[in-house]
UniProtKB/Swiss-Prot annotation:
A motif ('KMSKS' region) lies at residues 270-274. GO terms for cellular component: cytosol. It comes from the Bacteria. Zn(2+) binds at residues 122, 124, 149, 151. This is Glutamate--tRNA ligase. ATP binds at residue 273. It catalyses: tRNA(Glu) + L-glutamate + ATP = L-glutamyl-tRNA(Glu) + AMP + diphosphate. It is found in: Cytoplasm. The lineage of its organism: Bacteria, Bacillati, Actinomycetota, Actinomycetes, Kitasatosporales. Catalyzes the attachment of glutamate to tRNA(Glu) in a two-step reaction: glutamate is first activated by ATP to form Glu-AMP and then transferred to the acceptor end of tRNA(Glu). It comes from Streptomyces griseus subsp. griseus (strain JCM 4626 / CBS 651.72 / NBRC 13350 / KCC S-0626 / ISP 5235).
Length: 504
C-alpha cells in the first residue's frame, strides 16, 4: 500500500472532463422535499453545464427498500420534470443503475482493497467494541474504532477464526489530516483522530453504503457530488477511499464535493422526512405545479437575484451556480411556497390552467355528480378562478356553486353575511336582478349596487348576502361574472331559497 503524503484536494477537478453528477436515493418511504431539492440542484447543475445527470438507485437494504417506493421515485421525477440522462428505464454505459444488481462489482473491489492492504478483516464483537468505546469516553478520548484489528498477524487471524468469529471488512484510514475544498463551504480539514477506520463490508459479505456509494461514483465517472449537509462527515472517509481506488486503477479522479444546507422545519428543527409538510405527495395532492414547487425549493439555499423570487426552470438553469449556494440552514416556509405556486398558476395560459385543473373537477375531489359538470360553464369561469387559487385543489370550492343543485351550507358564512336587515336587502336586490340584463355582469352589479344604496349600504356590504345566498360562501370568484355564468333562473331561485330560510 502506498504511503505518499495525502494530497490537498481542490474544489475544481474539471480537467476538461464533461460534468457528471448523480442523484442516488434509496427506495424507502415516500419522496420528501429535501430529496427533491437535492435532485433539483443536481439537475440544474447538469443542465447548466450541458453535463450528465445519472439517476442511481441505492437499494442494498433489503429490509427497508420496496418496489413501491422505487416506482414512486420514478413517478415523482417524471412529474417534477427532472429528466435524467442515465439510469432506470433509460440505461447507459454504466448499467445497471440499481445497486442491488451490482453486488459482484462491490465484492471484486472489496477483494482488491483487502489484497492491497487498504482494508483488513476486523473480528471485534459488538460487546468488545462497546466496552472499549465506553472506556475511551470515560478517559476523554475519541470513541471511534481504536484499530484493534488493524495489524493482526496471520496467526492471530487464524486464532480468531478458530474461535468461530466472523469478520467485517474495515477500510484503513490514513494517519494524517485530510483537507478538501467544499464547493459550498470552502476549505475543510479533518484530523485523523476524528475519522477512524470504518466498515465497508458486513460479516455476511453484504457491502455497506460506505463502499458502494463511492465505488459507484468512481465507476460511473462522477465529477461532482452535490448532496445534503448530513453527509459532510462521511466525505473524508470517501476521499481516502478514492485515493485507494485511484491507485488500484478503479477511479480516475476524486470528485469535487458540495454539501447543501439543511432544510429547517417548525421550531428551527431539521425538517424530517417524517414531518407532514415534508412529503412530496402532499404537494401533489394539493395541486402544486411542479414549476411552482421547484421554484420555491431552489430558494432553500440559493437565489437567482436579491429582489427576485419568481422564475422559470429555464431561467433557473441559466443562472444556477453551485458556488452561489449558501451554507447556512434554510427554513421551509409553507406560506411562501404557496405564494410562489400561486404566481406560477397566474403565469399559465388559460387553456393549460383549464386542463391542469381536470383531476379536481371529478371524483374523488368533486362533491357534485359527474353528470352535473358543465364543461362550457367551467371554460367560462376558469379565467376568473385562475386569478384566485393558490393551489389547483382550491378550484373545487371556488366553482362548486356552478355544479351543485344547491350551494354549500356554511353557517359561519351565513351568520357573517346575514346581518342587519338581510330580508329587505335581498328582496330589493332580487327585484333589481330580475329586471337586469343577465348577459352583462355590469348590469348585475348595478342591480345590487342600487339595492344597497336603497338601504344605506355600500356595494361590499350589499353584495355579501347575495354572494352567500348564491354560492354559500363569503369569499369567492367575482360575484357578478359568477351570477352571469350560473344563469338567471338558478341565481334567482337561490335568492328565493335564502329569503325563505330567513323568514321561516
Amino acid at each position: 500500500m502506498a504511503n505518499a503524503p495525502f494530497p490537498k484536494l481542490s474544489a475544481s477537478l474539471d480537467q476538461g472532463r464533461p460534468h457528471r453528477v448523480r442523484f442516488c436515493p434509496s427506495p424507502t418511504g415516500n419522496p420528501h422535499v429535501g430529496l427533491v431539492r437535492t435532485a433539483l440542484f443536481n439537475w440544474a447543475f447538469a443542465r447548466h453545464h450541458q453535463g450528465t445527470l445519472v439517476f442511481r438507485i441505492e437499494d442494498t437494504d433489503a429490509a427497508r427498500d420496496s418496489e413501491e417506493s422505487y416506482q414512486q421515485l420514478l413517478d415523482s421525477m417524471r412529474w417534477l420534470g427532472l429528466d435524467w440522462d442515465e439510469g432506470p428505464e433509460i440505461g447507459g454505459p454504466h448499467a445497471p443503475y440499481r445497486q442491488s444488481q451490482r453486488m459482484d462489482l462491490y465484492k471484486d473491489v472489496a477483494e482488491k482493497l483487502l489484497a492491497a492492504g487498504y482494508a483488513y478483516p476486523c473480528y471485534c464483537t459488538t460487546e468488545e467494541l462497546d466496552t472499549r468505546r465506553d472506556a475511551a469516553r470515560a478517559a476523554g478520548k475519541p470513541s471511534g474504532y481504536d484499530g484493534h484489528c488493524r495489524d493482526l498477524t496471520a496467526e492471530q487471524k487464524a486464532a480468531y477464526e478458530a474461535e468461530g468469529r466472523t469478520s467485517i471488512v474495515r477500510f484503513r484510514m490514513p494517519d494524517e489530516a485530510i483537507t478538501f475544498t467544499d464547493l459550498v463551504r470552502g476549505e475543510i480539514t479533518v484530523q485523523p483522530e476524528n475519522v477512524p477506520d470504518y466498515g465497508i463490508v458486513r460479516a455476511n459479505g453484504a457491502p455497506l453504503y460506505t463502499l458502494v456509494n463511492p465505488v459507484d461514483d468512481a465507476l460511473m465517472e462522477i465529477t461532482h457530488v452535490l448532496r445534503g449537509e448530513d453527509l459532510l462527515s462521511s466525505t473524508p472517509r470517501q476521499i481516502a477511499l478514492y485515493r485507494a481506488l485511484i491507485e488500484l486503477g478503479i477511479a480516475k479522479d476524486t470528485p469535487a464535493f458540495g454539501h447543501l444546507p439543511y432544510v429547517m422545519g417548525e421550531g428551527n428543527k431539521k425538517l424530517s422526512k417524517r414531518d407532514p409538510q415534508a412529503s412530496l405527495n402532499l404537494y401533489r395532492e394539493r395541486g402544486f405545479l411542479p414549476e411552482g414547487l421547484l421554484n420555491y425549493l431552489s430558494l432553500l439555499g440559493w437565489s437567482i437575484a436579491e429582489d427576485r423570487d419568481i422564475f422559470s426552470m429555464d431561467e433557473l438553469v441559466a443562472a444556477f451556480d453551485i458556488k452561489d449556494v449558501n451554507a447556512n440552514p434554510a427554513r421551509f416556509d409553507l406560506k411562501k411556497c404557496e405564494h410562489i405556486n400561486a404566481e406560477h398558476i397566474r403565469m399559465l395560459d388559460v387553456k393549460t390552467f383549464t386542463e391542469a385543473c381536470g383531476p379536481w373537477l371529478k371524483a374523488p375531489f368533486a362533491p357534485w355528480a359527474p353528470e352535473a359538470f358543465d364543461a362550457e360553464k367551467w371554460t367560462r369561469i376558469a379565467p376568473y378562478a385562475q386569478t384566485r387559487v393558490t393551489v389547483l385543489s382550491d378550484i373545487t370550492d371556488n366553482v362548486d356553486f356552478l355544479f351543485l343543485d344547491e350551494p354549500v351550507e356554511d353557517e359561519a358564512s351565513w351568520t357573517k353575511a346575514m346581518k342587519g336587515d338581510p330580508v329587505a336587502l335581498l328582496t330589493t336586490a332580487r327585484a333589481n336582478l330580475e329586471a337586469a340584463d343577465w348577459s352583462d355582469p355590469e348590469s348585475l352589479k348595478n342591480a345590487v349596487l342600487t339595492a344597497g344604496e336603497a338601504h344605506g349600504l355600500k356595494l361590499g356590504k350589499a353584495q355579501a348576502p347575495v354572494r352567500v345566498a348564491v354560492t354559500g360562501r363569503t369569499v369567492g370568484l367575482p360575484l357578478f361574472e359568477s351570477l352571469e355564468i350560473l344563469g338567471r333562473d338558478r341565481s334567482l331561485a337561490r335568492v328565493d331559497a335564502a329569503l325563505a330560510k330567513l323568514t321561516a
